[in-house]
């Protein structure tokens, strides 16, 4: 596990930006180059977030379980040894339904393949790799804003 902590300019929800509340973002990919690249890309995300990278899904699940109230987003590769990405996000959503989840894959995902899991709210977004770092930052901003708006409505 690696911790990469960023503190950046904080914007208000009124401006449509990320809430000032700090939260954890987990990146889970068995390819360490991808997880580090994704973590580096998140330096451009407004707000204070702590980014944790994992190359082992079971290690990620253990960390999430111990910190579930702090996680706002988990980005997870679909195809991994051991516990695959879909099974990991199912466990994450069971532990913390409010945590947003994004599945990434370098393999082509057939239309409708994961639609049931999206409709059930298990997967919040599917990202096809490769993705530009600007595209990743925007997707993360969207997911974090969605999570914060949902929390603030309660």
What are these regions (language model features)?
Residues 53-73:
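Acidic, metal-coordinating helix/loop segments flanking the phosphotransfer/catalytic sites
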Residues 141-154:
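The C-terminal output helix
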Residues 104-106:
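Hydrophobic/aromatic residues positioned on beta-strands within the core alpha/beta folds
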Residues 32-52:
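Two-component/phosphorelay signaling modules centered on CheY-like receiver
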Residues 80:
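Receiver (REC) domain active-site loop signature in two-component systems and cognate sites
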Residues 77:
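Active-site residues of response regulator receiver
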Residues 2, 128-140, 144:
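C-terminal output helix
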